[in-house]
Regions:
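Peripheral interaction segments used for macromolecular assembly
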Residues: 1-130
Length: 130
């Protein structure tokens, strides 16, 4: 008997690949060794394609003083269901030198040269060329 034959039958529960954006915000980002890098502050979504272009990580600071935001191309993050966190392979030096902006400022998302710099830094394909 299929679900169409029995309207009260429940579908099998399987893990799914979709998640609401507000559930991604606040998710921890770790290195492969488990060390915390930061947390996802927000996602930047391409309005035309609907694809996630960047995860903006909040990093450092205490009580938001000195906190930086790091826009990271989405393709550089990998989700690890075992720990419920995203992972990025990045060293302390790479993190310190990564393009960032102060938490009380805003990145100029309209400046394609800044986005190109981000993609070059992370050796990631530009989302607009996918």
């Amino acid at each position: 008997m299929t679900m169409t034959d029995n309207p009260i039958a429940k579908p099998e529960t399987k893990p799914h690949a979709l998640i609401a954006s507000d559930r991604v915000e606040g998710t921890v980002v770790r290195r492969p060794n488990g060390e915390k890098v930061g947390a996802i502050e927000r996602l930047m979504i391409d309005k035309l394609s609907g694809k996630v272009a960047y995860a903006v990580l909040s990093f450092g600071g205490f009580l938001r003083l000195g906190e930086k935001h790091l826009p990271i191309p989405w393709e550089r993050l990998k989700y690890d269901p075992a720990v419920g966190a995203y992972s990025i392979d990045i060293t302390d030096d790479e993190l310190a030198q990564a393009p960032s902006f102060a938490a009380d400022k805003e990145f100029d998302w309209g400046d394609r040269s800044q986005e190109t710099h981000l993609h070059d830094y992370y050796k990631a394909r530009p989302y607009w060329g996918m």
